[in-house]
């Protein structure tokens, strides 16, 4: 009996050993993968084209072919970057590859190449071989979409889960529990919140901004620099229509005050990493992060109280501040960054509107969850939030446009939520440039309303006292989730721009912005414990007078 047991144990041991040997024998077939490549680079002759192998163990038995030439390996192991020209790769990526195909620099070893290995831009393919047998293949345009500067990534068994361009970041989403968040809106109270943060900063202020022409904010930042606060600003160098004379004057003024200013922009044939730096945020003292939908302009952050409708939040949390600082530093480290060159443009004169309507005051809430949203890295969080909506969605957008080959997916998600029973309201800007063409806000609103759902409405904001235009890019979902962002609802903004936003999970935050939304929707503050003395709106006074007059007339007639 004992002998049989020993024999059985020995048999099991032999089976286990054989299984281990087989696993070791077959594991190399899955040990390496092509995880990234760029066939159409920015350097001359596509010298910066490259591919990346990821895995463990020796690469000696591995090779990559494009169907014409083959790259083989020696003693390399682990993640290995193979570029066509190491020096040109360095000029674009600011780091050298592990191997190069063309001998360009002694800093990079040469790869073993047979015949001509060069990826074609429009139609080609790569095949990974192990001991001469194919284990992975990818081709374009069949498997991935071709394009200049397109970087293709293989993650979780799928190619290109998002559009990547050379030099773009890949930040993961993180959620923080913020100690304190101050909610505010433009035009009512954004200026006081932002200047307050600037005035309280002692050590550092970093700003990432699309446009900057505000005289008062420039003066506040210059004062901060003079008192010893280190101020650094990153600007979009080529906004739509070009950088204005006033903006150049503001940046000259700040530069003379000692502020470090940089621009991100295309240069010649070398495109910037992002179509536009469209962000609007600042971080003070590595602790307070301000994210807003508005640019630093008199219309966006008005001192007088009259201007664009926009939403913002100042988050007091070191984790959120660190996250945005890392994004800022990544943006500042790219090949497309240029120091500001002092020009002759003069500091513009301050302009103030004679209309000062301040309906809403800032409101501070505590202990709420905050998730940064960064485009193009984590734009998908917006779609996820819309797809998870259950009871209500209030959307306030400067504009919504469909994609060239499909409907806007975020709008489709909102409509689908309404079809499933959620109350959905969509408010869009009514300025002429958002309503003049044949496929802009008024057509979008009409299409939404034509669906005939009582719980789905779309409106155009055309007239609210003190509001010049609707420039917001936010929503409120299920009375508990708020989006504050710079992200427009088009293809380019979430896909190609650098953008910034916040998802705030808080019933108090949702209530605050719902009150603002209701005011814009109906012209009435339904419930706003955070509002200032709302003041008297002449429209309501007149309406009340008319009603009172009718009541008096009715009573008089009854008595006579």
Regions inferred by a protein language model and the residue ranges of each:
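C-terminal membrane-anchoring or membrane-association module
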Residues: 549-560
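HKD-type phospholipase D/PLD-like phosphodiesterase module
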Residues: 98, 103-116, 122-123, 131-136, ...
């Amino acid at each position: 009996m004992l002998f049989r047991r020993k024999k059985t144990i020995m048999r099991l041991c032999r089976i286990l050993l054989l299984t281990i040997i087989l696993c070791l024998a077959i594991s190399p077939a899955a040990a390496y993968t092509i995880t990234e490549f760029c066939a159409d680079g920015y350097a001359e002759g596509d010298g910066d084209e490259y591919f990346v192998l990821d895995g463990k163990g020796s690469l000696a038995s591995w090779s990559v072919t494009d169907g014409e030439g083959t790259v083989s390996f020696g003693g390399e192991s682990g993640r290995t970057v193979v570029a066509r020209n190491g020096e040109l790769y360095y000029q674009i990526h600011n780091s050298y590859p592990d191997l190069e195909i063309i001998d360009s620099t002694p800093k990079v070893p040469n790869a073993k190449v047979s015949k001509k290995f060069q990826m074609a831009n429009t139609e080609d393919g790569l095949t990974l071989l192990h001991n001469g047998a194919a284990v992975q293949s990818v081709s374009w345009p069949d498997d991935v979409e071709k394009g200049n500067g397109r970087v293709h990534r293989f993650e979780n068994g799928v190619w290109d889960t998002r559009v990547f361009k050379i030099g773009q970041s890949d930040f993961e989403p993180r959620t923080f529990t913020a100690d304190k968040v101050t909610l505010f809106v433009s035009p009512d109270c954004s200026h006081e919140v932002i200047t307050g943060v600037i005035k309280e900063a002692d050590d550092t202020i970093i700003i990432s901004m699309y446009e900057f022409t505000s005289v008062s904010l420039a003066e506040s930042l210059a004062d901060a620099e003079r008192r010893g606060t280190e101020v650094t600003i990153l600007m979009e160098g080529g906004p739509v229509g070009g950088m204005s004379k006033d903006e150049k004057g503001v940046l000259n003024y700040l530069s003379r005050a000692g502020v470090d200013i940089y621009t991100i922009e295309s240069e010649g044939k070398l495109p910037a990493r992002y179509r536009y730096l469209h962000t609007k945020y600042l971080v003070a003292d590595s602790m307070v992060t301000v994210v807003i939908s508005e640019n630093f302009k008199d219309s966006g952050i008005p001192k007088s109280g009259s201007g664009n409708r926009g939403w913002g939040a100042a988050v007091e949390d070191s984790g959120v501040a660190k996250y945005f600082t890392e994004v800022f530093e990544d943006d500042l480290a790219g090949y497309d960054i240029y120091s500001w060159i002092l020009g002759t443009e003069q500091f513009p004169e301050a302009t103030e509107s004679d209309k000062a309507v301040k309906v809403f005051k800032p409101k501070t809430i505590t202990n709420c969850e905050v998730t940064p949203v960064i485009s193009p890295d984590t734009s998908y969080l917006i779609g996820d939030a819309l797809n998870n909506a259950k009871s209500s969605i209030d959307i306030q957008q400067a504009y919504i446009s469909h994609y060239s080959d499909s409907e806007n997916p975020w709008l489709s998600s909102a409509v689908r939520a309404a079809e499933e029973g959620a109350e959905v309201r969509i408010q869009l800007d009514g300025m002429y440039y958002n309503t003049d063409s044949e496929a802009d806000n008024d057509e979008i609103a009409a299409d939404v309303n034509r669906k005939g759902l009582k719980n789905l409405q779309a409106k155009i904001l055309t007239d609210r006292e003190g509001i010049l235009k609707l420039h917001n890019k936010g929503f409120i979902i299920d009375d508990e989730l708020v989006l504050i962002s710079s992200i427009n609802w088009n293809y380019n903004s979430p896909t190609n721009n650098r953008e910034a936003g916040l998802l705030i999970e808080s019933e108090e935050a949702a209530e605050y912005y719902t009150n603002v939304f209701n005011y814009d929707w109906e012209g009435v503050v339904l419930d706003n414990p955070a509002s200032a003395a709302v003041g008297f709106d002449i429209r309501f006074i007149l309406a009340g007078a008319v009603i009172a007059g009718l009541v008096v007339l009715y009573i008089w007639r009854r008595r006579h």
